[in-house]
Amino acid sequence: MIKWLARPADYASVWDAMKTFTAARGPGTADEIWLCEHAPVYTLGQVGRPEHLLNPGLIPVVHCDRGGQVTYHGPGQVLAYTLFDLRRAGLYVREYVDMLEQATLATLRELGLEQACRKPGAPGIYVPQPGGELAKIAALGVKVRNGYAYHGLALNIDMDLSPFLGINPCGYEGLRTVDLAACGVRTSVERAGELLAAQLARAHGQAVQQRAAALAGVPG
């Protein structure tokens, strides 16, 4: 199931809802994708270091249980929270992250951003800039509890990027961030979110089907 949350969504409230959903689910619970835009907020992951918060100003900071360092969420950015049963899909965490990245790349290509790419050793999706620099356009951060994943990814659509200057994005000093608008792609948060959710649902559904076929002894 794919659903949009009320916007702007309060980060702490959505995080609590994800934890509640995950704690209550069982083997038969359907997977869900939650889409939203957040009010401005910095989030610091489990291994996040305070020194990467350079100048948060008046933007609130939330320490959460996802992986990764610090990032920023705000209007003009779509969040896709993927509440997936990884055991049902037969996915390890690394395979799951790869699936999220591949689905994001497919979405960007569908939107016409063919040059988007991954960066070895640095999760997320990047766009080459003049001079060869890679600027980050999508950030990933996940949590897996008892085989159930939550949190997900953030894709920059058309937003005020200046709050990223108040942090070392994802723990990398001087890492540049970019959005679709700056890359010449004009689209809405709603359209980008729907395309992204469709790619994520398709990729995860294929993994679930392949896992079921393997357990049944049927060639995939």
From Swiss-Prot:
Pathway: Protein modification; protein lipoylation via endogenous pathway; protein N(6)-(lipoyl)lysine from octanoyl-[acyl-carrier-protein]: step 1/2. It comes from the Bacteria. The keyword Thylakoid does not apply. Substrate binds at residues 66-73, 139-141, 152-154. It catalyses: octanoyl-[ACP] + L-lysyl-[protein] = N(6)-octanoyl-L-lysyl-[protein] + holo-[ACP] + H(+). The keyword Acyltransferase applies. The record marks 136 as: Lowers pKa of active site Cys. It is found in: Cytoplasm. GO terms for molecular function: lipoyl(octanoyl) transferase activity. GO terms for cellular component: cytoplasm. One of its GO terms (biological process) is protein modification process. Residues 27-208 form the BPL/LPL catalytic domain. Pfam families: LplA-B_cat. Keywords: Acyltransferase, Cytoplasm, Transferase. Its EC number is 2.3.1.181. The active site is at residue 170. In the reaction, the free carboxyl group of octanoic acid is attached via an amide linkage to the epsilon-amino group of a specific lysine residue of lipoyl domains of lipoate-dependent enzymes. Belongs to the LipB family. Catalyzes the transfer of endogenously produced octanoic acid from octanoyl-acyl-carrier-protein onto the lipoyl domains of lipoate-dependent enzymes. Lipoyl-ACP can also act as a substrate although octanoyl-ACP is likely to be the physiological substrate. This is Octanoyltransferase. It comes from Bordetella pertussis (strain Tohama I / ATCC BAA-589 / NCTC 13251).
